Amino acid sequence: DYWTALSYYKYFPPPYAMIDCVAADLKLFADLGVDSFYAETADYMDASQQFVPLKFWLAYQLLVDPHQPAEPLVKTFTDGYFGAAAGKMRDYLRYLRGRIDAEAQFKMLRDEPHKLAYLDRSFFQISETLFDEAEALVQAGGLQAKHIEVERFALDGALLFMWPWLERKLPAGETLPFERDTLIQRYERGWKSLISSRYSR
C-alpha cells in the first residue's frame, strides 16, 4: 500500500533520487502502448528527495520521446542548473544512485532507516567532499550556489540524524571527520533555501 509505505519515521530524511525510476517507468509505459497517465507526485514536497527539478524536467522530455537515453538529458539539465559545478553534482548523483542500487533495503527505509547500509561513514565523507568541491566552483550566494545548497540540505539532515549511530561505530578515541556546529549552520541555511525555492514564487 503506497499510502502507508513510508508512514513510519516520517521525520527522518534519508537522501534519495528518483531519476532512474522516471526513465524506466516512462519507457515501460510507452512499450505497453499507454497513451496517457496520471502521475501523483505529492512526495515532491519531501525534503529528503534530491534533484526534484531534474526529475520533473527529465519527465517532461521523456514524455516527448520515452526511448531517448536519459543520461544526455541529465547532462543538459545539470550543465545549465549547476553551471561549473555540474560535473561534481553528477558525480554525487551517480554515487548516490550506485550506493542505493547496490544496497537497496526498502522495508528498512520504512521501519528503521538509521540501519540503512548505504548511510555509513564512507557515504557521508565522499558525499560531503563532492559538495565541498561543487560549492567551490560557483559564485558564493549566486543562483547556482543556491541550487547546490538545496541539494545538500537532505545530505546534511541525514548526517545530523545519523550522528549518534555513526559515533557508536567509531574506534575508541576517534571522532567523526565533520564539524558539527558548521554542519548545523549550513543545515539551517539549506532549509531556508529549500523553502525559498519551493514556496516563494
Describe each PLM feature range.
Residues 1-87, 91:
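Structured mid-domain segments that build the active-site/substrate or prosthetic-cofactor binding neighborhood
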Residues 32-34, 58-201:
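Catalytic domains of carbohydrate-active enzymes that cleave complex glycans
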